From Swiss-Prot:
Keywords: Membrane, Mitochondrion, Mitochondrion inner membrane, Translocase, Transmembrane, Transmembrane helix. Pfam families: COX3. It is found in: Mitochondrion inner membrane. One of its GO terms (cellular component) is mitochondrial inner membrane. One of its GO terms (molecular function) is cytochrome-c oxidase activity. It comes from Marchantia polymorpha. This is Cytochrome c oxidase subunit 3.
Amino acid sequence: MSVSQKHPFHLVDPSPWPLLGSLGALASTIGGVMYMHSFTGGGTLLCLGLGMILYTMFVWWRDVIRESTYEGHHTFVVQLGLRYGIILFIVSEVMFFLAFFWAFFHSSLAPTVEIGAIWPPKGISVLDPWGIPFLNTLILLSSGAAVTWAHHAILAGLKQQAVYALIATVFLALVFTGFQGIEYIEAPFTISDGIYGSTFFLATGFHGFHVIIGTIFLIICGIRQYLGHFTPKHHFGFEAAAFYWHFVDVVWLFLFVSIYWWGGN
């Protein structure tokens, strides 16, 4: 097996995964619409499409890890391109959350008469920001410190220490997700309670979804670190996970300050 390539550029091999992923996305979209309108077979098609997407994600990323770790395809130029890619991806995620913050501030800065011309809307009992939300803020910031600890350990060649740091990060992420679930269960309002409920659950819910994705990302990095895939000079997979996790931290700080603290007063 070749362990290097004669050029520094990112040229991918022929792969069936883009086609399979596209078919999975098509099936899940059509199946989702059919399921929402109670058509026969909609749920089955939706599950099939989601299964295809999950399988594609697994095998495609498996191939990327093989190309990077065992075949030497990720040269400096390729890694630079991947860094630009993850940065642009995070910028697109910023735009995604910007829509939710825009909806929240549009509604809260100039509340309409339909909601009592006040914010929070009349009849809404808000959550105490200094309870679970503040605790979750401390937990998520601690997880950000732990992932930074893991990064420095990898740079220093301390394999075991990096594994421990990633375990701590994943543990804190799971605790955060658990507390978020408890908060949702005990919330005195629902997503159907007007603009406050919809913006609250959409913004915090999508953030929670990103936390789950980031947790899976970090678990994979922990396994790879345990297997010795990362070196002080070659660990972009971990760097991408760390970039993503710090983005999740920053979004939560904005959510806490704007929706929980300012928006709840």
